[in-house]
Amino acid sequence: DSYDELVQHQGEELESIRKYLMPGKLLILERPLVIAHIYTKLCEAEEKQIHIHADLSCSLENIDVPDIFLIEIIGNLLDNAIDEVAVRGRYEKIRIAIMDDGNEICISVGNEHEKILYKEYRMFFEEGYSRKGNRRGVGLPYVKKIVDKFHGRIEVGNIMYEADNYFVVSIYFKR
């Protein structure tokens, strides 16, 4: 009986890897620590029945941001998206994209969400502001400090994908 359970568990793990094409799809990023961290977050989302669409089309080697800070940025954005989707229940999709437009690398994370007004989402980067309750509101201000330190920029907004609204945070760094 335990052998059959082991085989079933291995099959489920292999299906999980195949489903996300991991780590193969992430290898384009060329930063092993960042790859491992993103993979962990994708597995966490999968465990919560959250669907993630990943559009990873470039290396992160061309930006001068140390791995630890990329992990902080991407981890925070994914944590926020996963938390928001898990709490709301009716939304179940997250998108992550890492792209190169020739001048900048864009790291973008969004989750399915009702539209958020500009006057509110600009407050997300203020220390202590949170829609999640007390003792929160430190992650995005920290992300902003990192982005500023490495001369990047942040854009936030509502974007439509396949007729669904997503709240998206995009971080840009010069190549």
Regions found by a protein language model. Give the residues of each.
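Short beta-to-alpha transition helix within the HATPase_c
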Residues: E12, L27-K48
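Conserved short strand/loop->alpha-helix "switch" segment adjacent to the catalytic nucleotide/phosphoryl-transfer site
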Residues: L26, I52-I73
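A short, flexible helix-to-loop-to-beta junction within the catalytic ATP-binding CA
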Residues: A45, A81-R90
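Conserved glycine-rich
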Residues: V87, G152-R153
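Short beta-strand/loop element within the Bergerat-fold HATPase_c
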Residues: Y91-N103
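Glycine-rich/acidic phosphate-handling loop/turn and adjacent ATP-lid/helix
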Residues: I105-R135
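Glycine-rich phosphate-binding loop
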Residues: G133-I146
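Detector for a conserved hydrophobic position within an alpha-helical segment of the HATPase_c
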Residues: V147-H151
